[in-house]
């Protein structure tokens, strides 16, 4: 028998420009997700929670709040991209080419576009990824670029994790 560490995510050295990560988890968006998120964020646009109103639009049904889509697809990418994040530096060029509806299942993948050493911090590097989210039919519903500072190997707080006493 051997003791094996669980997945600890990628560190700066693990990324190569051009790498594509197909994030492992899909997520079906529910009516509750949409209503809860619009209430939580105080988004009062009727298109998100008034089925009668939405039935009169070109979409014929409520749209999922687009900021939920940003949050969901960002979250899906964490396991592969930013599990060892020092800081999220922001999103760029967020595009929402197609709507998300209640009942859609969203999947995502990210491509590494840039990688460089941090000029001010020796324990991290900076990567730029382009992430795309798509539904169960393969239709792209969101794309964005995200820049993150990622710890180098042996430099993260996880490196000082204590062992269980026996």
What are these regions (language model features)?
Residues 1-90, 153-166:
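Hot-dog-fold acyl-thioester-processing enzymes
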Residues 1-17, 100-105, 109-166:
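HotDog/MaoC-like acyl-thioester-processing domains
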Residues 61, 74-79, 84-119, 134:
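Catalytic-pocket segment enriched in acidic/His residues
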């Amino acid at each position: 028998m051997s003791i094996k560490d669980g997945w600890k995510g990628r560190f700066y050295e693990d990324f190569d420009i051009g790498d594509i990560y197909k994030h492992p988890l899909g997520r079906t968006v529910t009516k509750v997700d949409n209503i809860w998120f619009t209430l939580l964020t105080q988004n009062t646009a009727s298109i998100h929670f008034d089925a009668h109103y939405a039935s009169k639009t070109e979409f014929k049904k409520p749209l999922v709040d687009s900021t939920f889509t940003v949050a969901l697809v960002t979250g899906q990418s964490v396991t592969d991209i930013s599990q060892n994040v020092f800081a999220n530096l922001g999103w760029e060029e967020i595009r929402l080419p197609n709507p998300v509806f209640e009942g859609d299942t969203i999947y995502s993948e990210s491509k590494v576009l840039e990688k460089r050493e941090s000029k001010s911090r020796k324990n991290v590097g900076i990567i730029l990824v382009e992430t795309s989210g798509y539904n169960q039919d393969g239709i792209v519903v969101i794309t964005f670029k995200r820049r993150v500072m990622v710890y180098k190997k042996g430099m993260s707080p996880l490196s000082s994790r204590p062992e269980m006493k026996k």
